[in-house]
């Protein structure tokens, strides 16, 4: 909400249906936002796809591995809470998240899969338990399930780096979010902060060698592991096809502990962030600014004419 998201017009889905009907081969539709679909939306989707041979494929990682990475993504959308504050908010009442409601919509994984299984049938649902130790595992397993030749799906060769933030970098972004002027809109934040300063940091492997990773406290790992076990049990009870190790519990790989507050940021880190404005984004901003100003002026004209009448 107010962070670049928008509802798709019905015509876009009609176009998609047309493409599916005209296609003579396997079509793949993929979006991370499908995990947030509620029962009503899924029922409508099933009606629109009636007549097609639909197979649903989930990729799955244990909940404890999702905590630090999810927090970083929310930071990039303007979150103003520290990691510890955010963890306390999501675990205060699992299923509800005051500051980031989409977190549990996506990560109560047993509930997510159950909704899809109820709508499309468990026999049409598969889940791939991701194995990070095997770089090609996800691509090869997915290709096998879909029935396409191996090698078509692979890691992009020239993909831009998108590493995790260090704790100091995350602290810098948190402070920016907390002090960001309220009178500036999302477009400005996205261009200058999200796709500018912060992207400049994450697209480079350069960082202060003394900087820590974001550490997750033991209590949060334990809470997440407990909820993960519940989700795994629910997924197993659904009778869907599972590929990989759903019982993995290698949570000792997660950096744990408590980061000390950051009181100073290395000057090199600040310099890299400051030169990160994306020029392509700035070009797009011109069009947005003109559109915004046009509707602002149109609104004033309409109000003035209504007063005259």
Where are these regions (language model features)?
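Anion-recognition interface
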Residues: 1-309
């Amino acid at each position: 909400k107010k962070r670049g998201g928008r509802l798709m017009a019905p015509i876009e889905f009609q176009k998609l249906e047309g493409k599916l009907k005209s296609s003579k081969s396997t079509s793949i539709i993929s979006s991370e936002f499908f995990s947030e679909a509620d029962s009503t939306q899924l029922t409508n989707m099933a009606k629109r796809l009636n007549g097609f041979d639909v197979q649903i494929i989930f990729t799955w990682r244990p909940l404890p591995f999702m905590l630090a990475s999810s927090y970083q993504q929310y930071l990039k959308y303007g979150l103003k809470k520290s990691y510890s504050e955010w963890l306390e908010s999501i675990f205060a009442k699992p299923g509800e998240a005051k500051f980031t409601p989409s977190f549990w919509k996506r990560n109560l994984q047993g509930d997510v899969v159950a909704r899809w299984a109820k709508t499309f049938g468990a026999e049409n649902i598969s889940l791939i338990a991701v194995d990070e130790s095997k770089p090609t595992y996800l691509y090869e397993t997915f290709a096998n399930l879909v029935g396409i030749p191996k090698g078509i799906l692979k890691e992009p060769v020239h993909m831009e780096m998108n590493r995790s933030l260090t704790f100091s970098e995350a602290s810098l972004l948190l402070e920016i979010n907390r002090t960001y002027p309220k009178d500036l809109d999302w477009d400005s934040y996205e261009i200058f902060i999200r796709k500018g300063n912060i992207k400049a940091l994450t697209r480079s492997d350069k960082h202060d060698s003394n900087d820590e990773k974001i550490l997750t406290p033991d209590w949060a790992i334990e809470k997440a592991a407990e909820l993960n076990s519940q989700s795994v049990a629910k997924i197993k009870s659904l009778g869907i096809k599972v590929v990989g190790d759903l019982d993995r519990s290698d949570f000792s790989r997660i950096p744990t502990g408590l980061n000390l507050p950051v009181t100073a940021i290395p000057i090199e880190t600040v310099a890299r962030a400051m030169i990160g404005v994306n020029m392509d984004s700035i070009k797009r901003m011109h069009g947005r600014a003109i559109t915004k100003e046009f509707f602002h002026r149109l609104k004033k004209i309409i109000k003035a004419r209504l007063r005259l009448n």
